[in-house]
Amino acid sequence: MNEELLRLKNLCVDYKVKEGYLSAVKSVSLTINKGEVFAIVGESGCGKSTIAHSILRLLPDRNEVVKGNIFFNGEDINEYTDKQLEKIRGKEIGMIFQNPLDSLNPVYTTGFQVAEGIMLGNVTREEAWNRVVKLYNDVKMSDAEKRTKSFPHELSGGMRQRVMIAMMISRTPKLIIADEPTTALDVTIEAQILNIIRKLRDDFNTSVMLITHNFGLVAEVADKVAVMYAGEIVEQGTVFDIFDDPKHPYTKLLMKALPRKTKHEGRLKTIDGTVPRLTTDIQGCRFENRCPYKIDICEEIDPSNIIVSESHSFRCHLSEGGESDE
C-alpha cells in the first residue's frame, strides 16, 4: 500500500508585478508517496520551479501570495512559522538546485560545507569528516578524500552536482527536491546522476520531486509524471500513462515534438503560438490559443479535471471518456 509523504492541495502562487498579479501557479494538486520519484515536466516558465521553491518557502522576495495546502507527513507546513519550517528544511526536505556553483560557498572547501550540516547532529569533527568521505564515495566521486579539500571552482559541473547530492543525503531527508539536476551536464555524467537518484530511492526509500523539461530523464527514473503548462497541471499519471496513452492535447503535442532517432520522421515538430500572458484574467483553457482541437467552450470555461483511471487524469473539454471529479 502506498504511503503518502507530500500532498499539495490547490496550491496557488501569485507574484505582484507592475500590471497587477502574475498567476505563476494555479490550483496545483498532487501527491508524492514514500519511495517514489515524481517528475514535474513542462517548458521554461511554466511554474515548475515555483512549486518546488514554495514548498520550502524559498521564493524570491516579490510580494508573492501563496495559497492552498502543503501537507508533509500529514501536517500542513504552509501554516508553519519560519522557525518551525527551519527544523525540517534540509533535515526532512532537501533540495538540489539547478546550478550547484551558485549554491556552494566559493571560500570554503566542499568537504567543509558538507561536514557543516552533519555537525548539526552533535557529532565530532572527525566523525563528520569521515562521513563526508563516505558520502563522496557513495555518490561516486573519484578520489573522494582528495576532493573533500577542493574548492567549488576546482571541480567540474558533474562533481559539483555530486557534492550537492552528498550534502542533501548527509541528513537522510525523507524528500529530495531536484530542480533540473542534470542541466548543462554531458550524457555520461547525466547517466551517473540518474543512477545516484535511483540508488537513493532504493536504498533509503527516499522520495524525489524531479523538476525537469527533459523527457528522456523522466522516462529513465520517474514513477509518476505531472505535465505543466502556464502554471497549471494539465495532465498527470504514471510514466506509462503519460508516454503510452497521453490524453491532453498539450501532452500529445509535446510527445510528437520529441526528437526521434530514425531519419524517417521528417522535420522536428513544434507547437505553434505562445504562452498567454499570466497577468491577465484568463477565461477558459490556458492552452486554447495554441490547441489544434479547440472548440467554442474552450475560450469561455475552465476545463474540469477528467479522471481516466486511479492514477491518470487530465484537464480538457475533449474528455475522450472518463468522469469529472468536479
Model-derived segments and spans:
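Conserved ABC ATPase signature
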Residues: 150-155, 159
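Conserved ABC ATPase "signature" region
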Residues: 76, 126-146, 255
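A short, proline-enriched helix->beta-strand linker immediately N-terminal to the Walker B motif
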Residues: 170-174
